[in-house]
């Protein structure tokens, strides 16, 4: 019985084993089919990503091609423009100019209306070309330049005429040969006398007012000038002929002038100047190259006087404000000659105070007070008065001027100005100087 049971169990297992294997195979087939389906879906997703990436790549390639084409066209245009500029420069270069090719032309001027009291310059009211100057600045070779100035009209001229202003060769930064940068440069020719500061801003476009100070010390003369800068210090010194003739010097003695400047910071400037005109021939030179009081230094001696001279010293200060400036200067002068009969030596003093302030962005106001104290012997001081009357007539003992002005700056190259100046003084004979007040309106320009 037991043997039969065992035999039956064995027979059952032998029959069921293949069936179990077949069931396992069916399960494996079903799992494989599911994996294949998932792989197909992933493949489709990857293909879609590749298609999108290919589209992006094609768009980027198109943009790169456009940029490259634009860059090529831009380069072509730049090359063409550079070629045109070279051709234009070659055409514009003056014939026979063998320098570096750097040449600049410019002009400055002022036109307006001037009227004064009966004893002034303009008793009838004059429309006038107040200033007109032409400039030429050219590079000769490296660090050597030429500068020339032609005056067609000036405040001091009685008519429109051609006169030579500055003209010099500038040997720049000679100190570089010794390893010192900008310590020494040299000008040779016809230059402004380096005395004081006002002359550097007396042109119509640079002067915030229309009038100048009463002393108005300035001059152009032939000679040699040395200038440079060391740290916060600057200097200029010149040896010049000293007399008014432009083509001759009638005395071996020369004019010597110099200025030492100091800039401790960006808003403060200080300077000290000194000058001697040197001995001037009373008949040959006749007048100094240096202007003073809208006139000159001239001989004040008698018939036996053959030589005369003047010595001067001045201190200047400028305070640069965010919306304006303050300027002041004061000085001393001494005149002497070799008159064998009389002692004509005399000392005098002068000063000026100036303030300029922006009212609005382009509108500004300015005021200047100046005075000359010439002492009991007096000096020939013209001021706003008639030249013939006050330069060759009775000498002036003291005189003052108050100038009030407004200006509108359309740009740094175009300024409209108006000013009223009060001026009074006394002559050595006790008479008063009056009726010299002046009104002026002017348009100053530069290009």
Model-derived features: where do they sit?
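Bacterial N-terminal signal peptides
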Residues: 8-18
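Short secondary-structure boundary/capping elements
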Residues: 31, 126-128, 135, 218, ...
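Bacterial N-terminal signal peptides that target proteins for export
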Residues: 1-9
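N-terminal periplasmic/intermembrane-space "pro-region" immediately following the signal or transit peptide
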Residues: 21-110, 447
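Hydrophobic membrane-targeting alpha-helices
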Residues: 16-21, 430
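Outer-membrane beta-barrel pore domains
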Residues: 51, 120-121, 147, 168-171, ...
